[in-house]
UniProtKB/Swiss-Prot annotation:
GO terms for molecular function: deoxyribonuclease inhibitor activity; protein domain specific binding; protein folding chaperone. The modification Phosphothreonine is found at T243. SMART domains: CAD. The modification N-acetylmethionine is found at M1. The record marks D117, S118, D224, T225 as: Cleavage. The gene is Dffa. Keywords: Acetylation, Apoptosis, Cytoplasm, Phosphoprotein. It comes from the Eukaryota. Heterodimer of DFFA and DFFB. GO terms for cellular component: chromatin; cytosol; nucleus; plasma membrane; protein-containing complex. SUPFAM superfamilies: C-terminal domain of DFF45/ICAD (DFF-C domain), CAD & PB1 domains. This is DNA fragmentation factor subunit alpha. Residues 306-331 are annotated as: Disordered. It comes from Mus musculus (Mouse). Residues 17-96 form the CIDE-N domain.
Length: 331
């Protein structure tokens, strides 16, 4: 009698080759070399080799380098041989730890306490990879990200970018120039604001502004008593962005392009309530963020256009160059 082919009886032609991998628990430095043809097989061997109790299953496999969760077989097959995995039980979370060269292990109890520092350790690497893919993304970075890359030792950043230390020193110098330019722009805006304030006082406009602010304050109080609290709860901005908006002069120069876009999309009234501002100030800051975002995107687009133009004009390797025209004899 012929047996029907099911999930337990794979086609011999579909048998996948074994992939060598390295396994470890997230609280141990000991790692084991295993070979598996699928994620399910790797999970099974992880439970067996690492003595993970069945009560702690299902386990999650993450890349030891950056904590990426691996739950897709096709992605698993694309990984190189001897990829390092960390096996996480159901009550554990991955966190970056640089003390052992980038391998991660942490128990659930210590996860919350160590989270900020570890995230910062991973964040600069993610920003560095972004620059590696497209150098023009420097324009889109926040001041915090720019400073983080400047503070990283040259050797570490060079290793992450696969560049020489001399090249990375030039890059860090460029990053510092971008920071300096934003600071100069901030100081210029502050001076302009002071000048405008002086003009307002001389022109006796201040009294009119007080009346306007009083009216806006009454409007804001009405919002607070009714819809205001609901709007404040609807603000989706991170607390770090709100702090930057409230405390930094010319905050649009400190934010990343992604943060600028988030601020631009917020409801002005909700933003005003969240920051305890009048609506006019919230709208002014939103407009500044929108303008700064458009400027950065335009700069990136210009860089890409110049790059494409340069690539079209440069002959490909092996491509014959056009012969230059001979100069006419003036005699």
């Amino acid at each position: 009698m012929e047996l029907s082919r099911g999930a337990s009886a794979p086609d011999p032609d579909d048998v996948r080759p074994l992939k060598p991998c390295l396994l470890r628990r997230n609280h141990s430095r000991d790692q084991h070399g295993v070979a598996a043809s699928s994620l399910e097989e790797l999970r099974s061997k992880a439970c067996e080799l690492l003595a993970i109790d069945k009560s702690l299953t299902p386990i999650t496999l993450v890349l030891a380098e950056d904590g990426t969760i691996v739950d897709d077989d096709d992605y698993f097959l694309c990984l190189p041989s001897n990829t390092k995995f960390v096996a996480l039980a159901c009550n554990e979370k991955w966190i970056y730890n640089d003390s052992d060269g980038g391998t991660a292990w942490v128990s659930q109890e210590s996860f919350e306490a160590d989270e900020p520092d570890s995230r910062a350790g991973v964040k600069w690497k993610n920003v560095a990879r972004q620059l590696k893919e497209d150098l023009s993304s420097i324009i889109l970075l926040s001041e915090e990200d720019l400073q983080a890359l400047i503070d990283i030792p040259c050797a570490e950043l060079a290793q992450e970018l696969c560049q020489s230390c001399a090249t990375v020193q030039g890059l860090q110098s460029t990053l510092q120039q971008v920071l300096d330019q934003r600071e100069e722009a901030r100081q210029s805006k502050q001076l302009l604001e002071l000048y405008l304030q002086a003009l307002e006082k001389e022109g006796n406009i201040l009294s009119n502004q007080k009346e306007s602010k009083a009216a806006l304050s009454e409007e804001l109080d009405a919002v607070d008593t009714g819809v205001g609290r609901e709007m404040a709860s609807e603000v989706l901005l991170r607390s770090q962005i709100l702090t930057t908006l409230k405390e930094k002069p010319a905050p649009e120069l400190s934010l990343s392009s992604q943060d600028l876009e988030s601020v631009s999309k917020e409801d002005p009234k909700a933003l005003a309530v969240a920051l305890s501002w009048d609506i006019r100030k919230a709208e002014t800051v939103q407009q500044a963020c929108t303008t700064e975002l458009a400027l950065r995107l335009q700069q990136v687009q210009s860089l890409h256009s110049l790059r494409n133009l340069s690539a079209r004009r440069s002959p490909l390797p092996g491509e014959p160059q056009r012969p230059k025209r001979a100069k006419r004899d003036s005699s």
